[in-house]
Amino acid sequence: MAPQSTAIFGIVRTDCAQCQSPKGKSRGSLLRERKLVTFCLHALLLLMEPKRCSWAKDPLLIEYHDTEWGVPSHEDHRLFELIVLESMQSGLSWLTILRKRQAFRAAFFGFDPAKIAKFGSKQIDNLLANPGIIRNRAKVEAAVTNAQATLKVQQIFGSLDSFLWNLVDRKPVINHWTDSNQIPAKTSLSERLAKEFKAQGFKFIGPTVAYAFMQAIGMVNDHETGCDRHKELGGD
């Protein structure tokens, strides 16, 4: 336990000990004791709460941050899902996408590229009438095109995983940002990936979307250095 945490814990332990008063106390004394108990509980909760990146505030964002974001992903199925979701997120908040994620999964057959690649105008029109997803024709059509491109990449490179992770020699890039505001919207590496995507026929994946995708699949560790996940995912 860090020195600061030890000091706080000492205060909590002392104050909680004061709460154990004998019977017969006045109403004022009981109220003070209740306040001390409340203080103790709040202090303990603060000690137990994980340190997170500053953007993880909403419960959905916290869960995503703690369990998915920045975790190296190598399963083609998940990689394709994030290609679709990140391209859908363009111009919107990630929280909006997370809130619609289950609807996306249902509408896109669990993000099965083989099924999505066969979508025609009828299926696309059905998607555009679905209030649970992002009803943007260009983005929906891009999802179909990207499913077709994914199948092509799997034939050429053996897997979507190989195509993507060879860009960083299969090792995550560990960054050291102290604040999320320091993180760039794109990098030379994401510009290179965007060109690779375009060369293989992918659409709606520019350098900014490509970088968000790289963060999501753990190609780069962009957790803040003060966040517990930074070290847990290979940061020093």
Spans of features found by a protein language model:
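A general signal for intrinsically disordered, low-complexity N-terminal leader regions
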Residues: 20, 45-46
